[in-house]
A protein has these predicted regions:
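M16 family metallopeptidases and their MPP-like homologs
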Residues: 5-40, 44-94, 107, 111-115, ...
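Conserved, carboxylate-rich catalytic/transport cores that coordinate ions
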Residues: 163
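An aromatic/glycine/proline-enriched structural segment found at the starts
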Residues: 135-140, 173-238, 340, 395-430
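Short Gly/Pro-enriched turn/cap motifs at secondary-structure boundaries
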Residues: 1, 219-222, 282
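Peptidyl-prolyl cis-trans isomerase
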Residues: 95-99, 103, 154-156
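PPIase-associated folding chaperone regions across multiple families
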Residues: 242-251, 255, 268, 401
Length: 430
């Protein structure tokens, strides 16, 4: 309970209904996303504009959004209007209208987004990089070009079936933060007791392809004045709060997470060939990638890759300096100190506690790790999780400008289409 402000935040996590659930019906990719957005549209008793007006009248907010493994329902209300807000939540959750016109509009929007992702170098880089990481069978490696084919096959009956199967309290969680006693809140939520449970199947995921050696991949984007670069690999680290994943993030802070990181200082401040270069670990319950990302002046593509590999090599082999370690400790501690100020941030904190079954003092444990992690441990993490000989290097840019620079780097070089398949004929290039 938080009494500083007269407001209440709620977050439902409907587990199993995230975009990974599309792996169960690969010919209907996009179904989870379309369903989630339709839940933000009309209900049986309110049109979409009428519902928006009703919520605005009382200063409330209800939104459905989707993540990897769950659909999230986020609710915000002034304390004095919580009863009416929950009535509207009940309407949205249990009485979606699923109007044909709204379904057609939302499906069309997703098709347009998928098409747009094939036109920008940065978007192409993201989708081809995922294909390299996860392969061509796993849903996480499926490009938007496939969505452009599957979205038109989704019907309104598919949406209704998905809603019936996946929008369930089975294994779901609810977190509440705000100016209300727990018992009073539970009484107001008793309408959830009648919610019928259904057991949805687990996502079907596939083993990632092995990376035998560092390889350079190229996808052509005609006329691109900037080159999009992605460099990295799929780690074996699931997300954690106080173990190896957290510590690997501290290790990476100096290399590519801070504004004054080695990568950003080199490519932006020293070479002046980019607006920014970043690197990060990005896992969930499932192990995720370590990625260096940047966009550079096309003429400096080869230079950028040499400098990135040089910085990674130096960090993995020589490690962090005393000054860098001290700065990391100070900067991360200050950043985290401001991470739980608002009720919305506290909502996220509680959701994290639940999702990862974490100790309530995990932030204290994190602070202890930040303050005590040694140079030796940082350097060991750099050696272990910056595998110089097993990286995917992806470049998206104009072939005429970029290809000669790539060929001079000495890595195995493979050209791909914008959906990540090897080019065997020049006609495959856009």
């Amino acid at each position: 309970r938080q009494t500083e402000l007269p407001e209440i935040w709620l977050s439902f996590a409907l587990k199993g209904s995230g975009y990974l659930s599309d792996s169960l019906t690969m010919d209907k990719l996009g179904l989870a996303s379309v369903t989630s957005q339709l839940m933000n549209a009309s209900t049986l008793n309110f049109s979409e504009p009428a519902m928006a007006a009703e919520l605005e009248k009382i200063g409330s907010f209800i939104s459905f959004s989707m993540a990897e493994d769950a659909t999230f329902v986020t609710v915000h209300s002034l304390s004095k209007h919580i009863d009416r807000t929950l009535e509207l939540l009940q309407e949205k959750l249990f009485s979606p209208a699923f109007k044909a016109s709204e379904f057609a509009r939302i499906r069309k929007q997703y098709i347009e987004v998928a098409e747009a992702q094939t036109r920008e170098a940065d978007s192409i880089a993201n989708m081809v990089y995922d294909r390299l990481l996860y392969g061509n069978k796993d849903i996480r490696g499926i490009p938007p070009t496939v969505l452009m084919q599957t979205l038109p096959q989704i019907t309104l009956d598919d949406v209704k079936g998905y809603y019936k199967t996946f929008y369930s309290p089975q294994d779901s969680t609810l977190v509440v933060v705000g100016d209300i006693e727990q018992e009073a809140m539970l009484e107001k939520l008793d309408f959830l007791l009648d919610w019928q449970q259904t057991a949805a199947a687990k996502p079907m995921l596939h083993a990632a392809p092995e990376v035998e050696q560092t390889t350079l991949y190229f996808a052509h984007k005609a006329g691109a004045t900037q080159t999009a670069i992605r460099l990295g690999y799929l780690t074996d680290l699931p997300y954690d709060l106080t173990s190896t994943y957290f510590k690997a993030g501290l290790m990476n802070f100096t290399l590519g997470r801070a504004f004054n990181s080695r990568l950003n200082l080199n490519l932006r401040e020293d070479k002046g060939i980019t607006y920014g270069a970043r690197s990060r670990f990005d896992s969930s319950d499932l192990p995720g990638p370590y990625t260096v990302s940047t966009a550079v002046t096309a003429a400096a593509t080869g230079t950028a890759i040499r400098e990135i590999m040089g910085e990674i090599t130096a960090y993995a082999e020589q490690g962090i300096t005393d000054a860098e370690l001290a700065f990391m400790r100070s900067a991360v501690a200050q950043r985290d100190a401001l991470a739980y100020e608002t009720n919305q941030q506290k909502l996220g904190f509680l959701a994290t506690l639940e999702k990862y079954q974490a100790d309530k003092d995990y932030t204290v444990q994190q602070q202890h790790i930040i303050n005590t992690i040694s140079k030796a441990e940082i350097n060991g993490l750099a050696r272990n999780y910056l595998p110089l000989d097993q990286l995917n290097i992806l470049v998206v840019g104009d072939r005429a400008t970029v290809w000669p620079q790539l060929a001079a780097l000495g890595y195995p070089l493979i050209e791909l289409t914008v959906d990540g398949t090897p080019v065997t004929d020049a006609k495959q290039r856009p």
